[in-house]
């Protein structure tokens, strides 16, 4: 049961980190 909830959490973290990087990289370019 713990593993079932742990896997989606790790995936969400990876996606969140990717979005944060893209937002930081392209967000600055778009704003500038």
From Swiss-Prot:
Expressed by the venom gland. Keywords: Disulfide bond, Glycoprotein, Glycosidase, Hydrolase, Secreted. Its EC number is 3.2.1.35. GO terms for molecular function: hyalurononglucosaminidase activity. One of its GO terms (cellular component) is extracellular region. It catalyses: Random hydrolysis of (1->4)-linkages between N-acetyl-beta-D-glucosamine and D-glucuronate residues in hyaluronate. Glycans are attached at residue 23. The keyword Disulfide bond applies. The keyword Transport does not apply. It is an enzyme of class 3 (hydrolase). It is found in: Secreted. Its main location: secreted. Hydrolyzes high molecular weight hyaluronic acid to produce small oligosaccharides. Belongs to the glycosyl hydrolase 56 family. On the 2D-gel the MW of this protein is: 37 kDa. This is Hyaluronidase-Pk1a. It comes from Phoneutria keyserlingi. The lineage of its organism: Eukaryota, Metazoa, Ecdysozoa, Arthropoda, Chelicerata.
């Amino acid at each position: 049961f713990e593993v079932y909830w742990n896997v989606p959490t790790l995936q969400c973290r990876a996606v969140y980190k990717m979005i944060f990087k893209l937002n930081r990289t392209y967000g600055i370019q778009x704003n500038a």
